[in-house]
Amino acid sequence: SQLQTTFNTRRVEIQQTNAGIEPEQVLVIETIGSIKNFANAVKRIVGLEWMGEIEIDEILPDEDFYDEKHPEKNLNGRLFFIMTNQRALEEMLSLWQRYQSEPAMQFERGLTKFRDVFSYLKSIHRWDVQDRLLETGLIDIWQEDLDTDGNRVIQFEAELWFRKSAALQVASASYVSQLVEEAGGRILSQSVIDGIAYHGLLAELPASAERSIIDDPSTELVKCENVMFFRPTGQMVVGDTSPEGD
């Protein structure tokens, strides 16, 4: 299979941050326990020992995975598997979904090593609504703001996947702007900082649109694959370009 070939030839990049990632090529891997424990475990899997040789930059718990009773404990780790081979990526996703439905399933010859990897994982998925919106705390902040003033217009940041091409940056920002406007909002400013691979839009939405997203995050705007994160404005990198980039 393409999946076997890709892993056997090590045509997979594994990294702990999403810097420089093309969203079409990434699978988000959430580990049960820390990255260090995962790396130590996969070192013992024949054929995948190399996966345990990733440079561990052990990240302290952030608000996404914070355990109040044990603040020093790393509850979950997150890795990004980058594959240029789309067939291999789809095969891995499909294999994981089958395993989730039937953990005792029989793996085809050559794929049993993935069963061993899967036992250390909590989730494998494409970058989705969960990553874009639900883990940044924006929904809770919107709810608090609307509880205080039910009619307020609220600003937020949409951080886009960084594209090196200026034409792709314009196209990406234009599409997100269109979705914001269709939801009744508008773009206030845009910031592109090449040095840190950052592209962000400062936007605002009316209360009605925010309530719709709180009730059902799977809106066209939140599902937009051009967006990496939706964040509260306090977390935004400050820039000085207009929405048109002037």
Residue spans for each PLM region:
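Autoinhibitory propeptides
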Residues: 1-16, 27, 46-154, 174-245
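Calcium-regulated, polybasic anionic-phospholipid
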Residues: 35-43
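Short glycine-/aliphatic-rich beta-strand segments at the starts of folded cytosolic domains
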Residues: 17-33, 145-166
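Well-ordered, non-membrane alpha-helical segments in soluble/globular domains
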Residues: 38, 168-177
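Residue-level signal for secondary-structure boundary sites
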Residues: 166-168, 211
